[in-house]
Amino acid sequence: MKIVQLSDVHFGAQFRDDVFNQVIDEVNELSPDAVIITGDLTNEGLKEEYEGCKELISKLNVKKIIAMPGNHDYRNTGYLHFKKYFPFQAINELGNGVVVVTIGTARPDRDDGEVGYRQTLWLERTMKKYENKVTILAMHHHLIGIPDTGSDKLTIVDAGDVLRATLDSKVNLVLCGHKHRPWMWDFSNLLIANAGTTSSKRVRGFFENSYNIITVENGKIQVDLKVVGGKRTPLQDITKNYARFEDD
């Protein structure tokens, strides 16, 4: 099973059209089973941004595209447009024993994220149904703070409750975006993978536009960082010794 995670596309003022066209070519060549887009498909939540982004996303030759809104998609009441252009299901059984569950963290007129009591309870009850499968939880906002990103006021405000529910539910992998900073936290039985920005001009530090490639084989999960037009590297290598990538 092969899954691609795109994040923080930011179609609009920050968008790099040439980079995303390269992403389309690379993903189509990779031919994944699914593409997960963890939020901020647009920059300001405007209708014309949704239309332009939809046109580009439709060039991905994949059977399953799972998209969820980010805080930028909620701007200017853009959440009213989201499901029209990017309809999605919260529970996605991909086959081969892999299930992807999405939760919403974006809220109107807020840059921070929140899951809420009811959605957290739903998450726990839902994951119990799939405890014998490989479970992937996808959201926009980062669940845990990420190094080199300054103030961490924009994490999920109820992150402690969500993390507890995630661990109790034996989720195998959490996919996040939001911070434009690739990173991975490894809690032995739980991996939390943060994607960088796929196509925004607002990259952090020495990082480039990138996306993640997730491989699930025999119940084991591997997450690789793929620089657009560049190399593919295990995401865990960056967390272990990311200074090495700066030297490159």
Predicted stretch roles:
Residues 1-56, 125:
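N-terminal active-site segment of His-dependent metallophosphoesterases
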Residues 6-7, 35-40, 64-71, 104, ...:
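Active-site neighborhood of phospho(di)ester-bond hydrolases with catalytic His/Asp-centered motifs
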Residues 1-4, 92-102, 128-134, 187-192:
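Beta-strand-turn-beta hairpins that frame and shape the catalytic cleft
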